[in-house]
Amino acid sequence: MTEMEKMLAGEPFDFTAPDVAESLRRRRVNQAHFNAVSFDDGKAYDEALSALIPHRHPTARIMPPFYCDHGHRIQLGEGVFINAGCTFLDCGGITIGDHTLIGPGCRICTPQHPIDFEERRKPVETGLPITIGEDCWLGAGVTVCPGVRIGARSIIGAGSVVVHDIPEDSLAAGNPTVVKRKLR
C-alpha cells in the first residue's frame, strides 16, 4: 500500500513520501494560481478553483487568499462560501454541507500527530475527517480540530476552538467550544 493510499484510508502515513510530496507539489502550483487570479474574472476564477478543489459544487465560492494541503480531499456543497484567509489541512478529508458560511481566517485541520514524543519525531501523521453540516455558520477565526463533526444549522462563534462534536441546531462558542443554547 502506498503512503497516499494509507492517507486516503485514514491510516498513519509518511507525509514525506514521494507520492504524498507530489500531491503537495500539485497543490502548491494550483494554490498559487488560484490566489493570483482575480475574483472578478469569473471564468479564470472558476477554472483555478476547480483545479485546486475538484470536488465542489459549481456555486461554492472561496475568497482568496486560501491555503490547503492537498485540495482533492475537500468537498464543498451547493452555495458554500469561504471568506478570505482560511487554511484547510485536508489529509483526512473535509466535507462542508450546502449553504454553509465560513468566516475569514478560519482553520480546519484534519492532521493528528502521535502523542508519544519519540513517535512524533517520525514524519508520520493520521488524518481524521471533519464534517460540517448544511446551513452552518463559522464566525471569523474559528479553529476546527481533527475528527470533529458540526451538526446542520449550527453557529460557531468567532475565535472558537472546536475540539469535540457539536450537535445540530446549536449555538456554540469558546475555547474549548461549548454549546450555549439550542437554535431550534
Q: Where are the language model's segments positioned?
A:
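Active-site/ligand-binding-proximal alpha/beta "capping" segment
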Residues: 149, 163-164
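Flexible, glycine/small-residue-enriched loop-and-beta-strand segment within the central core
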Residues: 66-76, 81-150, 170, 175-184
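Terminal amphipathic alpha-helical/low-complexity segments used for targeting or macromolecular assembly
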Residues: 1-59, 176-180
